[in-house]
């Protein structure tokens, strides 16, 4: 079996010249307005308005417009964030289909309605605060069929105060539910449910975990002596930032390489109906479960041969950071891809899953060799 591993003897980062080749993607800071309102006990309506004078195609992935049970809003009670019970998907960002976009004309608005009780534990009821913030990637030109990303728009909603009826909230079914574990056994890696795998899928996942461990460990070792690159991806070189990055990457490396046990359970296939079009893999952070989707195997190489491209190894690394047993608090999807991730603030970047995946993927010197096991 072929595996890709970081050259541990070098443990260095390549020059940042490759970043110059990435097209500049302007942030339209005020192009999108998002207003939240309540339409029921836990039902939320988000009104998204294009404030500009050009039509926009808004990419739905990991935004307030996402059709999956993702983290569309933040919910707080008594100053503490309410437990999120939905899914955190990683989407394929190449060859985007028009169906992944919402078309919005100049000054036009679109509404999105969702029940936060389906993705949050609101069984206690009481007063809560709901807000939304994030980035929407935009495509311009060629009308409603535009799919080439040309920019991105940041948004921050109003704060919505609600008094939740606990009984009504408890009656709402959870979007993802609980997974009944029936783990198979293998000789190596974090808990893989082998009953969910074909031999080919198992081989691919074991290879991805091996590479995830190698990349994460090499990146952890390289970070303290490569502060310019740390600043590029995480916007800070403070000792606390570097220590957090190192600790989290080491945790990912450990979880990816545990023998016979681990804190997460990894499924080769989807048993929770989360693999909607465009989803490579997804995590249920409250249960520490990861699921691969069909296009993880069909559309991704084992490890990309150029910077910042998606692959199986860094998709697995990305998903590992979503698990609370690996990274606490678990990382979110605040910025996707190089341009978006490197435009985040320091506070956002340290909690962004793709920042770790890109840091590990984009700058490490790799070596391809034959290896039959870890």
Swiss-Prot record:
Residues 20-189 form a propeptide. Its main location: secreted. The keyword Cell membrane does not apply. Its EC number is 3.4.24.39. It catalyses: Preferential cleavage of bonds with hydrophobic residues in P1'. Also 3-Asn-|-Gln-4 and 8-Gly-|-Ser-9 bonds in insulin B chain. CDD domains: M35_deuterolysin_like. One of its GO terms (cellular component) is extracellular region. PROSITE patterns: ZINC_PROTEASE (PS00142). Binds 1 zinc ion per subunit. Residues 1-19 form the signal peptide. It is found in: Secreted. One of its GO terms (molecular function) is metalloendopeptidase activity. The active site is at 319. The keyword Signal applies. InterPro entries: Fungal_M35_metalloproteases, MetalloPept_cat_dom_sf, Peptidase_M35. Keywords: Cleavage on pair of basic residues, Disulfide bond, Hydrolase, Metal-binding, Metalloprotease, Protease, Secreted, Signal, Virulence, Zinc, Zymogen. It is an enzyme of class 3 (hydrolase). Belongs to the peptidase M35 family. PANTHER family: NEUTRAL PROTEASE 2-RELATED, PTHR37016. Probable secreted metalloprotease that shows high activities on basic nuclear substrates such as histone and protamine. May be involved in virulence. This is Probable neutral protease 2 homolog ARB_00849. It comes from Arthroderma benhamiae (strain ATCC MYA-4681 / CBS 112371). The lineage of its organism: Eukaryota, Fungi, Dikarya, Ascomycota, Pezizomycotina.
């Amino acid at each position: 079996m072929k595996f890709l591993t970081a050259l541990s003897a070098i443990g260095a980062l390549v020059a940042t010249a490759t970043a110059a080749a990435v097209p500049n993607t302007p942030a339209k800071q005020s192009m999108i307005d998002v207003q939240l309102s309540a339409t029921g006990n836990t039902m939320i309506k988000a009104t998204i308005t294009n404030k500009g004078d050009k039509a926009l195609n808004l990419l739905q992935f990991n935004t307030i417009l996402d059709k999956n049970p993702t983290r569309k809003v933040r919910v707080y009670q008594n100053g503490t964030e309410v437990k999120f019970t939905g899914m955190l998907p990683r989407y394929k960002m190449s060859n985007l289909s028009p169906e992944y976009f919402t078309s919005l004309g100049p000054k036009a608005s679109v509404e999105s309605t969702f029940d936060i009780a389906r993705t949050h534990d609101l069984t206690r009821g009481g007063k809560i605060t709901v807000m939304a913030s994030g980035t929407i990637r935009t495509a311009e030109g060629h009308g409603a069929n535009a799919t080439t990303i040309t920019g991105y728009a940041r948004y921050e909603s109003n704060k919505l105060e609600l008094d939740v009826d606990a009984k009504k909230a408890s009656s709402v079914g959870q979007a993802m539910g609980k997974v009944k574990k029936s783990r198979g056994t293998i000789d190596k890696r974090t808990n893989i449910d082998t009953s969910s795998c074909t031999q080919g899928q198992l081989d691919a996942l074991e290879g991805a975990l091996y590479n995830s461990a190698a990349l994460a460990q090499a990146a952890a070792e390289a970070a303290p002596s490569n502060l310019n690159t740390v600043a590029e991806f995480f916007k800070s070189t403070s000792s606390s930032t570097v220590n957090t990055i190192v600790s989290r990457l080491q945790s990912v490396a450990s979880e990816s390489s545990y023998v016979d046990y681990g804190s997460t359970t990894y499924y080769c296939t989807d048993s929770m109906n989360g693999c909607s079009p465009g989803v490579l893999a997804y995590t249920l952070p409250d249960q520490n479960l990861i699921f691969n989707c069909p296009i993880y195997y069909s559309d991704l190489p084992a490890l990309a041969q150029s910077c910042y491209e998606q692959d199986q190894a860094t998709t697995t690394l990305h998903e590992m950071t979503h698990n609370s047993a690996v990274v606490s608090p678990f990382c979110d999807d605040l910025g996707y891809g190089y341009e978006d991730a490197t435009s985040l603030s320091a506070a956002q970047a340290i909690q962004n899953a793709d920042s770790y995946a890109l840091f590990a993927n984009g700058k490490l010197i790799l070596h391809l060799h034959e290896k039959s096991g870890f």
